[in-house]
Amino acid sequence: MKYFLYLFPAMLLMSCCGALLAQDYAIPAVVKERFRTSDTNSERLDAGTIVKLSDYRIIVGSPQIRAEINGQERMVSGFDLKYLDFQLNGLSTDAIWYQQFLQSSALDQLSKRGWDQEVRRELQEEYLSFNETITLFDDPYLEDYLNQIRLQLFPKQPVKKHPAVMRIRVYESVEPGTFACANGDLFISTGLLATLQSQEELQAILAQEFAHIQFNHSVDNFRRNLSREARAAFWSGVLTVAAAVTETAVANQSIRNGTFSPVDLYAFGAFTESISMLSSAIAFQVANRLGMEYTFEQESEADQTALILMQHLKADNQALLNAYTRIYEAQRISRAYQLQTREERPYPHLYRQMLDLGYQLNYEPPAADPAYISVTAMARRNTAWQEFLSGNYERTQQLLTTQLDADAAVLEDYMLQSVLLRQTSNEAGDMERAMLLLRKAEQEAYSLSPEIHLEKAMIFLRLDEQEGARRELENYRNALKKTDNGEGQADRIAWVTQMLEKMSRGR
């Protein structure tokens, strides 16, 4: 027995060394309230003592951090970090993430359950099913831009053995939303990219979401959700709902009761396919399922880390508030907003978070950054068309105005603006404005879609300019004949031919 007593400290030290995670950082801090080290020395640390933290260990379920104090190596309990005032100036971005991890709720969870590998394996199975419910947005330029932002915010994984490898993926949805997966995959919606209006706002949101991943929030929440429906049954239900709500593009109908409405078109040119998206009808269920229905405390923890990262990057300290304000305003004009309970909305604690960040009534975020609007233009264009097809005309106009004001509009934007004006106005002045935009589109477009001639014809008819309408309908028919035969093309040619015959008879 006595030999065991002699050997036990050595065995414990060996086990601790195995748990020691060699970090590359020295995190300086100043003691602000007296406490003692957690090693056998139990040294008293008075206020003003300088401490440099490095590796952490988990010893008998307790988080311990190695510290250099007055040239001596000591151990500090993770529960005593609240007595330290961290000195972050001069630290690398990685070091700041490591310091934030040490101060977060993740360290306590790690000491109790390790990396929760069993839960993570179960979550990975859920992610495979989740991937089947979304459509990824294809824009290589945008993907590369987001990767550059990620490297600024999160250059590498600072916590050794952390299972997450950060990646950003864009999915199609009009709703401003994100899904921060425990494996490091961060899904961000086209609707959110369209809602934000500066790179710094995007950085703030991404930093906040990375914090959720880094601090294992979804893993913790998923573990607590003991009443989970069987995986196959749940995702089968989600896919059924998704199939019903994602058919946002109307089936092509060239003739409806003898008349034609361009609103019945797929949505011109590049938007002729059904658009699959994760709608608000199922986003809440999915977030809850995957452990991403965060508590207010988890949101606040992630918010504080985002603020610290933005300060470190010398970015606008109001960027997170600006981003939240834009999301809040976008939600309020959403047709789905009034039908949802607060808990069902993508950001259930959003207004409370805004207040904590200093939000006041009548607060106005700054003007949009044209460079950011240009980079994210395709996502905004996609969102605008989806909003239009859903009947959200106010939101559609907001998105179009953002594109136009930033000089980021292309043919599809001008055409959508024209269609929107016809859908919402009978004023001749609005029709004249639409015609000016269409002519500008013709001058700037790299290549013309046949539908621009159709849209110009509809505007001429609104203005009662029969000759102009006849000319553009001829142009439309000729352009259709030169293009590859697509679905419904024969019907469109037949319709425009009938229209020309009708006009020739003066009807």
Where are these regions (language model features)?
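Zn2+-dependent metallopeptidase catalytic core
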Residues: 138-161
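Catalytic zinc-binding patch centered on the HExxH motif and its immediate surroundings
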Residues: 169-184
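Short alpha-helical catalytic segment bearing the HExxH-like zincin motif
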Residues: 187-188, 201-209, 225-226, 285, ...
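Post-HEXXH active-site segment of zinc metalloproteases
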Residues: 218-245, 324
